[in-house]
Amino acid sequence: MRTLVVDASVAVKWLVLEDMSDVAKELYGTGDHLVAPRLITTEIANALARKTMQGMLTRDEAKYHFSSLPQFLPDLMDVDELIEPAFENACTLRHPIYDLLYLEAARKVDAQLVTADRRFAAKIAGTDLARHVTLLSDWRPE
């Protein structure tokens, strides 16, 4: 069993039907140890609230989906020790720190970050950091 870090762009696909939800659910079903920084709960809550405001979910549906997140990700990492290196990379790349926190979590546990965020993957392409990132569309079970 390997450890993988997932970000909110993947985890939200476990909760609500989106493009690539089938692949995200396959990833969850592998039995790999999936972890994320604690920040993911805020990002998932934001994504579900946005879907509620857009009329894609009722408030009760969003609350139900949010309450089920711990069954998917019981191990959340504290962000305090990830902040400094994530901040440095965010400044260097001129990119929001949120994505870099997930990347730093992957580096800390010597794992791959699986993301559906193509913009982030494109931003780090060609850097040494890219070797820690796998797009959900490129992910394959071992």
Give the predicted meaning of each segment:
Residues 1-40, 51-64, 127, 142:
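Short, well-structured N-terminal submotif of metal-dependent ribonuclease cores
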Residues 1-3, 103, 107-142:
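Acidic, PIN/NYN-like endoribonuclease modules and their adjacent C-terminal/linker elements
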Residues 23, 43, 85, 122-124:
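Phosphate- and divalent-cation-binding pockets in alpha/beta enzyme and binding domains
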Residues 31-35, 70, 112:
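Short loop->beta-strand "edge-of-pocket" segments that line small-molecule binding or catalytic clefts
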Residues 45-77, 83-85:
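Active-site-proximal, substrate-binding regions of enzyme catalytic domains
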Residues 74-119:
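Active-site neighborhoods of divalent-metal-dependent phosphate/nucleic-acid chemistry enzymes
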